[in-house]
Amino acid sequence: MSGKTRILFFLTCLSFLLVFPTRSNGQDLALSCGTSEASADQDKKKWEPDTKFLKTGNSIHATATYQDPSLLSTVPYMTARIFTAPATYEIPIKGDKRHLLRLYFYPSTYTGLNISNSYFTVEANDVTLLSNFSAAITCQALTQAYLVKEYSLAPTDKDVLSIKFTPSDKYRDAFAFINGIEVIQMPELFDTAALVGFTDQTMDAKTANLQSMFRLNVGGQDIPGSQDSGGLTRTWYNDAPYIFSAGLGVTLQASNNFRINYQNMPVSIAPADIYKTARSQGPNGDINLKSNLTWMFQIDKNFTYILRLHFCEFQLSKINQKVFNIYINNRTAQADTTPADIIGWTGEKGIPMYKDYAIYVDANNGGEEITLQMTPSTFGQPEYYDSSLNGLEIFKMDTMKNLAGPNPEPSPMQAEEEVKKEFKNEKRHAFIIGSAGGVLAVLIGALCFTAYKKKQGYQGGDSHTSSWLPIYGNSTTSGTKSTISGKSNNGSHLSNLAAGLCRRFSLPEIKHGTQNFDDSNVIGVGGFGKVYKGVIDGTTKVAVKKSNPNSEQGLNEFETEIELLSRLRHKHLVSLIGYCDEGGEMCLVYDYMAFGTLREHLYNTKKPQLTWKRRLEIAIGAARGLHYLHTGAKYTIIHRDVKTTNILVDENWVAKVSDFGLSKTGPNMNGGHVTTVVKGSFGYLDPEYFRRQQLTEKSDVYSFGVVLFEILCARPALNPSLPKEQVSLGDWAMNCKRKGNLEDIIDPNLKGKINAECLKKFADTAEKCLNDSGLERPTMGDVLWNLEFALQLQETADGTRHRTPNNGGSSEDLGRGGMAVNVAGRDDVSDLSSEDNTEIFSQIVNPKGR
């Protein structure tokens, strides 16, 4: 080979390596299944074809017919390997090493296949990872388009990792599929874990096979796999969606130049960014002693779980300055005479460490939930009464070589749709066969009808549904459209809990109460239909929302609102009394809100103008309602349609958030967002949500920012009659604020009546809500606190101050000990119903270890 040829060959190889990085240790492998060519994902990671590793079994390769917008990369999701019989991959490994295994699933439409028929088992060597698994049902339940399952496989005596896919024999035409397989050799990061509730007993995690359930950057932002440590490409998610109760505490952040010193553990345990942020209870020790930080997670019961808590102190430097108790499912992990003391464990600040705790979860100990609670300890009379956490990982341990949990159960409505689909297929087949033999057709038809009636009986039964399922009736993945009309022909199918929590009205009752839906009783019109003023039980005033059969909103939104509102009770959320779903009509019955919508009092109205103080109080009430949805309910709820017509006011000027037909449950165990069809109202719609079709609670924050400017300026969110730059209120107000002439566009009725400091605080809050990046927007807790503070400033200026903000902190960034502090608002206890008080404060405020 000539010198020039060698150089050309070297440069060619070098360019290839730059595009496709080599395996870091000779043991890492990423397979793009169903493709014949090497490719790279968005992070330039190389994905190889899977063909040479597929050793047994017949298979076909397929390409998805639709690319979901939530897919960050087509690799490895758009191609798949399909198995109609058992098949095995054999991947060479170093058997004496632990390995990360990731399985990538995209349950899309593949030509000639019905993804709902895909049920299969996956085994890695002798460990069952998935059993009778349906990626379609799981993604539908999680309201996302794709799924990644991650496992940490213990060392073995085999130098080959055999991954076997077996279609289920319980379903006709069942098949298995896989889009991507990733195998990464990793150092041994596990040892023993203290068994919670048992003194001096441990679980051996070093020999265990584990499934990664949750991996959280507590108090910080998402950390993508490309920024992980040790080459393990793990993704760390923000913890806020998993915080239970309204108390978010404060988020802490070390200064940029703060150094993390890995003295006592390998860097691959967690990246430095995990230890540079934290969440603590806050600066008020008196409040902290009466409350705690609580996280809640949904898991599979009858397994042992390892909770790895990451700690690093970057503020304090002495022992006994901050000590705290740790409880897991109300059992003591660290408390009494051995509370947690980070400096006591590490010796100095800047040194990261972790603690592993193991707990077995069954019906008698948590059921399908794990709660982690932290509260200050008074043992030793520490200098500060506080607790803090930097990171959290939760792993499921294998039981008798099994890690497989059940598929989530479909909602009653989803189950009914499956029955309808199957019954139609059965009728079609019966008709075809009938053309060949009438007697046989009658027999088959009878059998089909019997099966159908049995399945309908199941629908009416008490169907246990996994508690982390999305709100019933919502679209399951982006690109999915409802096939259910707006007319209810067969009645709704609600969970027993929802049906038991609200009243079911007969259609004659509704017609009598609204004078047969007389137009003179119409008090509003929305996307769902008309809203009527009515009377029930002789004297009780109600609002009745009647569906319009031609509306785009239909059964989905109807059931969503019932399932959601029947379980929520809060001073600042409109109360659902009951519903009616008979005679082809769908009606929702609410408490009557005497003063109507907020918008009615802002512009295009003959009603008296609202004072600035009253507007602030209404904004605060609405913020409390949204804050409760995001953090105070059992699971994060995203409203998705926040606007001034969905904020109602009662006769005492108490604001209540309404209209939950588009609401969705928030981020789940596999990500920090929900992938969904974009819905909402133009003018209020979060542009980031519109672009990415990824929904978070920060989308509500954006919409609320528009509401705040609407309150201030008394003009619509969109006004096409104005010059182009003024059409969007959000854009126009932001532009005026940046130029320093915001006062020129505020409501003329308010000019000269708003304290300057109050106006600045209010406008700054609205501006932060409208940040282009959701990550940079405040939480609703932050918004609530700032609005309370703005009201305090106004009352001080007016000489009418009679209340203080609900928490003693500040939502501003404060320089303190080389860190930034962000205080989240704490909602008023008085805003919760007695039921809420009992549930939250009996379990959260003062947990008792067992």
From Swiss-Prot:
Gene null: resulting phenotype: No effect on male fertility and pollen germination, but siliques slightly shorter. Anx1 and anx2 double mutants show defects in male gametophytes due to premature pollen tube rupture.
E.C. code: 2.7.11.1
Tissues of expression: Expressed in pollen, but not in pistils or seedlings.
Keywords: ATP-binding, Cell membrane, Fertilization, Glycoprotein, Kinase, Membrane, Nucleotide-binding, Serine/threonine-protein kinase, Signal, Transferase, Transmembrane, Transmembrane helix
Pfam families registered for this protein in UniProt: Malectin_like, PK_Tyr_Ser-Thr
Keyword Amino-acid biosynthesis assigned: no
Stretches for region Disordered: 796-850
Transmembrane segments: 430-450
GO molecular function: ATP binding; protein serine kinase activity; protein serine/threonine kinase activity; transmembrane receptor protein tyrosine kinase activity
Catalytic activity: L-seryl-[protein] + ATP = O-phospho-L-seryl-[protein] + ADP + H(+); L-threonyl-[protein] + ATP = O-phospho-L-threonyl-[protein] + ADP + H(+)
Coiled coil: none
InterPro entries attached to this UniProt entry: ANXUR1/2-like (IPR045272), Kinase-like_dom_sf (IPR011009), Malectin-like_Carb-bd_dom (IPR024788), Prot_kinase_dom (IPR000719), Protein_kinase_ATP_BS (IPR017441), Ser-Thr/Tyr_kinase_cat_dom (IPR001245), Ser/Thr_kinase_AS (IPR008271)
Cellular component, GO, one term: apical plasma membrane
Cytoplasmic side: 451-850
Main location: membrane
Compositional bias ranges of the Polar residues kind: 839-850
Compartment list: Cell membrane
Active-site residues, Swiss-Prot/TrEMBL: 641
Other information: Male paralog of FERONIA, a female factor expressed in synergid cells that controls pollen tube behavior. Named Anxur after the husband of the Etruscan goddess of fertility Feronia.
Function: Receptor-like protein kinase that controls pollen tube behavior by directing rupture at proper timing to release the sperm cell.
Entry similarity comment: Belongs to the protein kinase superfamily. Ser/Thr protein kinase family.
Protein name: Receptor-like protein kinase ANXUR1
